[in-house]
Amino acid sequence: MFLKILEPCDFSRGRFRIENFIESSKYAQNLFKIQNEIIQNVKDESLAENVPIITDEVLNYMIFTAKNIKAGNILEIGTATGYSGLFLARVANENGGFLTTMEIDEKRYGKAVENFKKLGLFEKNRMILGDALEEIPRLDKGIKYDFIFIHASKGQYLKFFEMSYELLNENGIIFIDNLMFRGLVAVKKEEIPKRYKTIVKRLKEFIEKLNEEYNFVLLPFGDGVGIVKK
């Protein structure tokens, strides 16, 4: 482990007011500019249809990280409509590699394929329709990945992680989004709605496992970002 879970700001001493934190998040989001009309449309349509996509500040940091490690082959678990994948595919292609992205929902997969084709990225990358738990074992074991992005079914995060970690290059990074699950992972047990107790319990156990056994850091922005370096 190179870093432990980051300590929150000390709001009680007035060093950093909660409203300032919210404004800081908005400011960070606004720094991320989409300079492509097609990608902007993908984002707008996804939000309009309530498709969960990565937030701007998390996406900005993820792409910054992938670029800085010069990620070639990239694996994405959870394509959705292809929004984050469009950015990752361009990073992979620029570094001489390709993106492999998986989506279980047929409708979203079809939309993602359409979006990739609009940007000329479909033929350069690999898009898979299917359950990642079944598709990951079918991947070529001879191909290793520099960067892996997990943002699919949270109840399966541990399985996704363990399966994909075996495919990660040395010094490669696994980037895991939405670890805090609407912030519920951080609240007291009695404050968690009954319908979310199981998923929150699983996420807490997953985070604790990563923190104890892997080179891991949890970043408290977006809805919680976990990073593991091999």
Can you describe what each PLM-predicted range is?
Residues 1-147, 154-175, 179-230:
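A short alpha-helical cap/connector motif
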